[in-house]
């Protein structure tokens, strides 16, 4: 064995590493304690910079120590000469770069660099752009570096066209770069501002076509990369709908006026203001939500005094003015009539689809054909399938309804982990289509049975519905938004999986409610029905609660105003 190098055993190596770690930890704790002691004593000098450098050089994510360095640098600013300060800043920038090499995604390091450059009279922004380019060359998805680059570009007033060209170079090198795609979505509206384009900033047709060609190259190259699909969705996205007062309804029986809006809003003295004019005279009223809770809501209502509803005049004119939304709506209650209303048409306003020009429709049709071609090559690509569904919705939801449902089935099979989300999205689209069909038929009856619905959406659009059939679906609850259905008289929700009735409250006209074959377990879940003053028929057959002894007597006590309860 003489003359041979001794090799440490694994136990010896482990022990050596343990001792080394203990030594490093001891030095780390000692240095940290010294820094805190000096800070507490107000000894903010260059020795603190040296101590924090030792720690941050190994662990750049110690936020408190970056705060200490800033405090020291602020004190040294007034003590050092301009030449000494310039040398100190240069050294600090070099130290920061070394920290970034240790951890390129260190929040504290990037923030400290922003702070430091913000205090310089003439920062070298070109150097900072070069620094960003170097780090993005190593990792083009480093969003910390992207944030810093946006800061630098803003401070240096770099033209958006130059930054767009920079994203071109990175995307060309690697399509899978979410940050580059996102940056493009910020830059393009700046380069091509469009009047009345909305907050999302729609693009001119020629620019849109060029971007679509670029993103198509991306998802045809790597169909499974989601970044290009997200950008594609942004390109074809719709602007937010304009603020609008959708429907105004007046009921003589309930002495109530109800109004629905395009978005939830909070009405009050310090928030949104609604003005009510009756026969061109202002009327002071108190606004409330259907469920009585003071929170943002699509639907608001108010009580009307008897004088505004009497039959002495041939008609009464009601006008609601939404001051913040710059919108108003007027309806007339004729003599001898019990109700009057005025509403926007979902078919005319295209509430559930993009508002498209002829050129844009042509573009979307072309995109749909391209995605179908890709789907033939990649039949199990979930992003492609979802995009096809959304494009069909944007083009013509009723024309493509049957085909859309087929694509949903395929998508659920491909992506079973998101089956519940897809079921809810499918339910949303089916309800939208049903609202459109109801308006085309000009009726107040809505049949949503046998549609396999899992959720109810857009209930604020059903303000005037009198009969609603939700039977044979997969609903687990009737949501609080159901209180928006102020005209509802008959509700059928048989053969679902309903466990809660919290949403069936304060429905002033509800007379018949059928809940056969659901999952209502305890009589207490029926308590909300007591708030429906005209409810006379309740069908609870084939629910678990019907098996309880004495259930008929219990329900009669719980709901004394309901004359017929079937169990």
UniProtKB/Swiss-Prot annotation:
Modified residue annotations for Phosphoserine: 98
> What stretches of residues are PFTA repeats?
44-78, 88-122, 124-158, 159-193, 207-241, 363-397
A single Gene Ontology biological process assigned to it is: endoplasmic reticulum to Golgi vesicle-mediated transport
Q: Write down any Gene Ontology CC term.
A: cytoplasm
The alphabetized UniProt keywords are: Leucine-rich repeat, Phosphoprotein, Prenyltransferase, Repeat, Transferase
Q: What is one Pfam family matched by this protein? A: PPTA
Q: Which domain of life is it from?
A: Eukaryota
Query: Which EC class, in a word?
Result: transferase
Activity regulation, in the record's words, is: The enzymatic reaction requires the aid of a Rab escort protein (also called component A), such as CHM.
Q: Where are the LRR repeats?
A: 442-463, 464-486, 487-508, 509-530, 534-555
Alphabetical list of PROSITE patterns matching this protein: PFTA
Task: Report the catalytic activity.
Answer: geranylgeranyl diphosphate + L-cysteinyl-[protein] = S-geranylgeranyl-L-cysteinyl-[protein] + diphosphate
- E.C. numbers: 2.5.1.60
Asked if Zinc is a keyword of the record, the answer is no
**Which SUPFAM superfamilies did the record assign?**
Outer arm dynein light chain 1 (SSF52075), Protein prenylyltransferase (SSF48439), Rab geranylgeranyltransferase alpha-subunit, insert domain (SSF49594)
Q: Which GO terms describe its molecular function?
A: Rab geranylgeranyltransferase activity; small GTPase binding; zinc ion binding
How this chain assembles, per its entry, is: Heterotrimer composed of RABGGTA, RABGGTB and CHM; within this trimer, RABGGTA and RABGGTB form the catalytic component B, while CHM (component A) mediates peptide substrate binding. The Rab GGTase dimer (RGGT) interacts with CHM (component A) prior to Rab protein binding; the association is stabilized by geranylgeranyl pyrophosphate (GGpp). The CHM:RGGT:Rab complex is destabilized by GGpp. Interacts with non-phosphorylated form of RAB8A; phosphorylation of RAB8A disrupts this interaction.
Question: Can you tell me which family this protein belongs to?
Answer: Belongs to the protein prenyltransferase subunit alpha family.
| Cited function | Catalyzes the transfer of a geranylgeranyl moiety from geranylgeranyl diphosphate to both cysteines of Rab proteins with the C-terminal sequence -XXCC, -XCXC and -CCXX, such as RAB1A, RAB3A, RAB5A and RAB7A.
Task: Specify the protein name.
Answer: Geranylgeranyl transferase type-2 subunit alpha
Give the gene that encodes this protein. Answer: RABGGTA
């Amino acid at each position: 064995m003489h003359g041979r190098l001794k090799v440490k055993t694994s136990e010896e190596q482990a022990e050596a590493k343990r001792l080394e770690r203990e030594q490093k930890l001891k030095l780390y704790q000692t240095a940290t304690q010294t820094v805190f002691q000096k800070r507490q004593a107000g000894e903010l000098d260059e020795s603190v910079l040296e101590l924090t450098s030792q720690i941050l050089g190994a662990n750049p994510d110690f936020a408190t120590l970056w705060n200490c360095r800033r405090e020291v640098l602020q004190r040294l600013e007034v003590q050092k000469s301009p030449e000494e300060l310039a040398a100190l800043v240069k050294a600090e920038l070099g130290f920061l770069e070394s920290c970034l090499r240790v951890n390129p995604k260190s929040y504290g390091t990037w923030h400290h660099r922003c702070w430091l450059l913000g205090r310089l009279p003439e920062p070298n922004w070109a150097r900072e752009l070069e620094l960003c380019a170097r780090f993005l060359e190593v990792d083009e998805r480093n969003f910390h570096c992207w944030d810093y680059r946006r800061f630098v570009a803003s401070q240096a007033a770099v033209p958006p066209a130059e930054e767009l060209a920079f994203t071109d170079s990175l995307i060309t090198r690697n399509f899978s770069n979410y940050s580059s795609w996102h940056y493009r979505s910020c830059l393009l509206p700046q380069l091509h501002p469009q009047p009345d384009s909305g907050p999302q900033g729609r693009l001119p047709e020629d620019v849109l076509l060029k971007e679509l060609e670029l993103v198509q190259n991306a998802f045809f190259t790597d169909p499974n990369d989601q970044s290009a699909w997200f950008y594609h969705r942004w390109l074809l996205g719709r602007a937010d709908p304009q603020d609008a007062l959708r429907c105004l309804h007046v009921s003589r029986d309930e002495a109530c006026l109800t109004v629905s809006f395009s978005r939830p809003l909070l009405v009050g003295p310090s928030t949104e203001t609604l003005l009510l004019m009756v026969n061109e005279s202002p009327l002071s009223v108190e606004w409330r939500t259907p469920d009585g809770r003071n929170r943002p809501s699509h639907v608001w209502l108010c009580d009307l005094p008897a004088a505004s509803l009497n039959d002495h005049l041939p008609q009464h004119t009601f006008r609601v003015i939404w001051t913040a939304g710059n919108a108003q709506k007027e309806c007339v209650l004729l003599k001898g009539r019990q109700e009057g209303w005025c509403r926007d048409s979902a078919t005319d306003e295209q509430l559930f689809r993009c508002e498209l020009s002829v050129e844009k429709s042509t573009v979307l049709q072309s995109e749909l054909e391209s995605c179908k071609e890709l789907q033939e090559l990649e039949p199990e690509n979930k992003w492609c399938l979802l995009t096809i569904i959304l494009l069909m919705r944007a083009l013509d939801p009723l024309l493509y309804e049957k085909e859309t449902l087929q694509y949903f089935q395929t998508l659920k099979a491909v992506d079973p982990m998101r089956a519940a989300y897809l079921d809810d999205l499918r339910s949303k689209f089916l309800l939208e289509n049903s609202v459109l069909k109801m308006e085309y038929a000009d009726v107040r009856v809505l049949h949503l049975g046998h549609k396999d619905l899992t959720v109810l959406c857009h209930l604020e659009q059903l303000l005037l519905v009198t009969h609603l059939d939700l039977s044979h679906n997969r609903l687990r609850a009737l949501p609080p938004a159901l209180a928006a259905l102020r005209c509802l008289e008959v509700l059928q929700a048989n053969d679902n999986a309903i466990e809660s009735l919290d949403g069936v409250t304060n429905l002033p006209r509800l007379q018949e409610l059928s809940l056969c074959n659901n999952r209502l377990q305890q009589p207490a879940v029926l308590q909300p029905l007591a708030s429906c003053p005209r409810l006379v028929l309740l069908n609870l057959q084939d629910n678990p609660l019907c098996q309880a002894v004495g259930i008929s007597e219990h329900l009669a006590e719980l709901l004394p105003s309901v004359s017929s309860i079937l169990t």
